[in-house]
Amino acid sequence: MLMRGWERGQGYEHGHGHEHGHGHEHGGFWERRPFSEVHHELTVAYATHKIRRVLDDGHEQVDEVRLRSYNGKLVGPTIEVCPGDTLKILLRNQLPFKEELVGDHPHVGPHGANVTNLHFHGMHVSPAGNSDNVLLSIGPNQDLEYEVKIPTDHPAGTHWYHAHKHGAVSIQLGSGMAGPLIVRGDIDQIEGIREARERIIVLQQIPYRLVTDPYDNTRQANMVEEFPQLFEVTWQRELVPQGRRVTLNGEVLPTFRLRPGEVERWRFIHAGVHFPFRLRLVREGGNPATESIPYYLIAMDGITTGRLDQVDVTEMHPGYREDVLVHAVGRDGRPLARGTYLLVDEVEQNPGARVLARVVVDGPPKMMRLPRPEALAALAPFKPIRDEELTSTTPQEARFEVQVVKPPPAPEFRFLINGKEFNPHDPSRQLTLGAVEEWVVSSVGAAEFFPGHPFHIHTNPFQLTDAQGRVIWKDTIYVPVGQQVRLRTRYRRYIGQFMLHCHIVTHEDEGMMQLLEIVPPRQDAGGPPGGGSGSHH
């Protein structure tokens, strides 16, 4: 792996790879030569890993698993770039050629599990050619060099890359084929963040099939090969009771260490395949309702909010990223008492599986300051979209729908957008470059099985209004069944085809995806550019 174009800034330190108990860390900030080429190589192949299981009685067991992986690791390498850089990634597919694992039919459901590609999730870059083009297919023993030109005005933030070959997304992402993609920039250099140590925390659900019967040769032991094991119900009813746990940078129950009074920047990336997380920091043995440790939300989906919002809990659905500042002080402003604290997931119903990490506060005090809110306010990258900026009075519609084809006890479903399953041969929904539009996104059907769907759209972020009436920018938003969300977005800079889909990726592989295309304005069109077609056609 070669990364060019970076120089160390003062006080820089970095925890390479995924060292036990540390994750990805750095202190200080990057200085760079502008407009550099950043080179990486990703080799996709089966690799053997060790993953701990934690049983309800406290006993632990280490499973040896065999998974499709990047560069032989459970989490892909961290890639760091600056605005104006060109990212070049040589993707080598060294998965074995098997006829049943390379086919492209049917168009929905699992297929082509050994064919791959890359998506640069959250990046505002071209979706065409060998850039962020998820229509590419790289088969076994094939290589492709991606070339991603990052615009000079790209906001600094937390993004990620992952496999996105339709029909194979869930099996490959469920195997851990994902890694952090960090855009460095202005926010990294402000006082209160520049001095903070950083942890990149990749949260994953690896639903490998556990086979304990040595005479059972009907299934692939300790691998992710079977589509049903990727669904939410399998994780909840079968895998968690076996001791399966969420991994953080490939580890189960890592330990993080802070000094009293210290500030750290944690970059959370939900790279899992199904359940959301509700993350809270609490003192070990304490009451979460009264003894949680607040932290400060500064970015969502890689986009600086421009605020320093104190929160007790953060809710993350698949595809989400959240940057928080953890300040090791109590609610009274004094250094946090030495001891052990826990990062817990309140979504998890099994009490033994709620703890995701231990946070040990120890050592001499290191009193650090948080950034000033006005310094963050100056870094919010986008202006709100007001009514007068809209170029169409008719919103675009995206309706996630699950139809129950066969009822329990062996239910079957269809996963649709606007009444249709994804078909790559259908015409794309046409959108016009330069248009500014509103979207109405809703979820309907089968709420007892699937309570909602995270809407994700490639290439351009969108704005929405949160429960407090504030404008926020994201690229992924959860839409509960029976509700709708109104979004606004600008189709800036890039033409080409890209996707919107549910980021519970089993739903995506089953057809809950739609092809979009941004096209140049018609030459005979007068006035401001118009909108899109309003429907898949």
What do the predicted segments below correspond to?
Residues 119-121, 162-167, 453-460, 501-507:
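Histidine-centered divalent metal-coordination motifs
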Residues 397-464, 475-501:
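C-terminal substrate/ligand-recognition segments
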Residues 158-164, 278, 331-349, 493-505:
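Short, surface-exposed ligand- or partner-binding patches at beta-edge/loop junctions that are enriched
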Residues 1-325, 330, 358-381, 388, ...:
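Histidine-centered copper-binding motifs that mark active-site loops
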Residues 80-82, 137, 257, 315, ...:
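Residue-level "contact hotspot" at macromolecular interaction interfaces
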Residues 283-302, 445-473, 505-508, 517-522:
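Active/binding-pocket-proximal capping segment
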Residues 321-323, 327-329, 341-348, 375-386, ...:
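Long, well-ordered mid-to-C-terminal structural blocks that present hydrophobic/aromatic surfaces
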